[in-house]
């Protein structure tokens, strides 16, 4: 889906509204249908309040930022950034492999991704610590390690605990190497490698613990979590343990001057030449989708982060993954440029032998992981001041066709001393 750009201040277009009647439908205009991509609440009687999914007819693109539209016979102004051209919706609904299993499992059959994951010390050591701190409780238990890869978590279980059995399930071809590693390390009596997809899994018994490292970009991308939840429902005992036990998605408004400078401002004067006409296409090319390998520095955070979603993996249902939405409010703590928002996730592991939990946090205030951070760039930076309020909403929506993909819709309002300064909305596909 093509993403929209953010809007400028309301005051920029007020002069053009004088004399217009918000309830009069202009005649003899070529009208085109647009879809509202996120809710908008009118701030005066020249504007329309709209909900996500509403359809409107464009009557007049008054400015780049504010359009005059008709909705169910009523006319008014709405931010252009909240609208998407209905004619550009070209999603292919007839695909042979909506899960892209061949591509997905193919990416895990070589060592490249496994080297990246095993080299991620915070990630891998967190799982090791979970096993170590709960080793007594794992004695004599049946453990399911779903999506085991090279089997590192299963190896930890065999080495540090005394389980009855570990079922190391892996659907990709790397399972052949995992079998050899189990033999080589002399743990084949404990660890049973099963090359199957989770949905086809057939175990000899239900398990006491289901452990998996299923997290992707923005926590959910690839949606391996669906397979984990299905395995939970089929194979985890009623009083069984899920590791991770809970998961959270976090967000913060941020400055990203270097990113914006390197990819947009660069075109102003390369080699003393004016290439500035390339700035709009550069913005669209580089910022239409999120930056998944961004490293956010703590000093670039413009406020304290917030937790958008808190998922209980013992009770979460697959249907809840289709669409998740949340409102947010940030209080800006320093003057600066708002270039966008950065997201990351954390997962928590229930302790069985003492109170509290262990946590793997992938955010900018914790040791860097291979997930890094996900940057959602605005099309243009916005000036903010200390004590400004940034409020809005975020919607995570799963792609109805390409089931491993999703979109993130961010809408925001910047307010200063109770007066709205800027309003905008942008849709980011990850990745279709």
Swiss-Prot record:
Active site: 213, 222
Pfam families from the UniProt entry: Methyltransf_25, PRMT_C, SH3_2
Transmembrane portions of the chain: none
Claim: Cytoplasm is one of the keywords in the record: yes
Superkingdom to which the source organism belongs: Eukaryota
Compartments, as annotated in UniProt: Cytoplasm; Nucleus
Region feature Disordered, mapped onto this chain: 1-22
Alphabetical keyword list: Cytoplasm, Methyltransferase, Nucleus, S-adenosyl-L-methionine, SH3 domain, Transferase
Class of this enzyme: transferase
Enzyme Commission designation: 2.1.1.319
Gene Ontology cellular component list: cytoplasm; nucleus
The SAM-dependent MTase PRMT-type domain, residue ranges: 101-405
Chain's role: Arginine methyltransferase that methylates the guanidino nitrogens of arginyl residues in proteins such as histones. Involved in growth regulation. Involved in embryonic dorsal development.
Membership in a protein family: Belongs to the class I-like SAM-binding methyltransferase superfamily. Protein arginine N-methyltransferase family.
Name of the molecule in the record: Protein arginine N-methyltransferase 2
Organism of this sequence: Xenopus laevis (African clawed frog)
